[in-house]
Amino acid sequence: VSYTAVLVRAAGLALARNPELHQLLAGTRRLRPARVDIGLSVANEAAAAPVMQLHDVPGKPLLALAAEIERRAPEVRAEDTRTLAKLRRWGFIVPTGWLRRLVLRRLFSSLRFRKLFGSLQITVLPSVDIVASGVNGTTAVLAMGRVSERVVARGGRPAVRLMATLCCTGDHKVWDGQRVGKLLGEIARILETDELAKEVPVHEAEAATHVALDSAG
């Protein structure tokens, strides 16, 4: 089980348990979707990573979610490569900056476009310790750097634990610092307990990556 799948599952559960945070902003409309969908950034050849739509994350057990991410990632990359090829061929049709800004403004006001990114977008960059991302098309972006062993204080004594730093950037029209803190607190609680480990059968757990880790940030 990848750490990416663990984070997606934890974030989906956290949003479902805090419905006041589960909102989409489309133009002047603030909407509350019936299900928690999450957009996962998938690295590809362009600077702007394509987003994999993961529907009803709270309703999918960890192993099923991990399998879906692994199965669909190549498909998302292939589709993005085809889209980039079309843009390189036909992008000259919208050459001027003001016209491109107009197109983007119309897109960001579209509920259908907003749903492409889910209620929350997640990006994971295991090559660095800390990563933060701007909000572009979604309500908030949750970012995680590498998971590594670090020394922390536990019960007044040093201990080695798997840790990761989470950074969350939210659209201030919908979220504020307190809401972001509430979401991160719930995600940390899920990650630091054995809640997700219980979703992995014993025979799978022996071969899987440990899913409980300490979080900071």
Language model features: what each stretch is:
Residues 1-217:
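C-terminal catalytic/motor cores of large multi-domain enzyme assemblies
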